[in-house]
Structure formats: structure tokens, C-alpha cells
């Protein structure tokens, strides 16, 4: 994973800088998220890395497939990635772009996994906790995973807090087996 981050970072930094200067951060974010979804498909990954397929032909077909979702500046970006065999990095680039944007706008994206749906008061309390923990406002992305039994898992900015019963049981089992 860190190798992907190392390879993707220069692209993500350059794209974010260009988007910021052009004032079209939202358009870039939307396009990158779309490209991330397209490249998540295993068939697309294979096609992008197939040495038998001509790069120019692949790029033309890829751009045609993405028509309506790619901003004008994005076409050159896609051509650059595809020509350098780096189109598979677009998911990592999209994630890094989102992190840069969050930092620029003064918030942090937080993945919240709970054992049950949160009530509004719990979400408010969690937001306050995240703001104290990360020294920035949190934008919560809540998912429910009943296997946690109870509690919550928070993932933000490379940090993880596992306050779930499932996590506690796993840690206990690990200690007992050692």
C-alpha cells in the first residue's frame, strides 16, 4: 500500500495544486471519484495493463467510456496516467486528493463503523469527540456492522480507534493465546 502512495503522491499533489489554482476542486473531486469507481472493476484493470492493447487505442476507448464525467483538463491527466502505465493508481490519487481537500477546507473525513444506527445525539457527541481528537471538524461517514456487537471503530487520517466489543474480544483472545 505504501508503494502505491509513493507512486501516486506526485500526481495527487500536482492535480490538487492545479485544481486549487483553477478553482475547480469540486469538479476534479467528482471526476477522480468516478475514475476510481471505473478502475475498481477488475476487467478495466486488466485492460489498462494489457501490453497487447495499444495505449492510444485504450486511451481513446477509455475516454469515450468516461464521456460526460471527465473535465477538459482531466483528459490530459488520463492520457498522462495511461501513457505511463499508472492508470491503476487513480483510486489512490482520488483518496489523496480527498485528504488534501479536507485539510485545505479544515475538516477530516472519519469512517465510523458502529454496531447499530446512530441517533442524532450520538452523532453530535461523536463529532465533538472527533474535533477534540483530530483538532479539526469531522465529516462522519457512518456504516453499520452488526459483527462489532457493540461500540464503535473510528478511522481518520491514518489513525484507528477500536472501541468495539468485537475488537476487545479479539485483543483478549490474542493475549490468551500468547
Curated annotation (Swiss-Prot):
Coiled-coil residue windows: none
> Which InterPro entries does this entry report, sorted A to Z?
ATP_synth_OSCP/delta_N_sf (IPR026015), ATPase_OSCP/dsu (IPR000711)
Membrane topology of the entry: Peripheral membrane protein
Please name the Gene3D superfamilies in this protein's record: N-terminal domain of the delta subunit of the F1F0-ATP synthase
Which Pfam families does the entry mention? OSCP (PF00213)
Its localization reads: Cell inner membrane
User: Keyword Transport, does the record have it?
Assistant: yes
Report the protein name in the record.
ATP synthase subunit delta
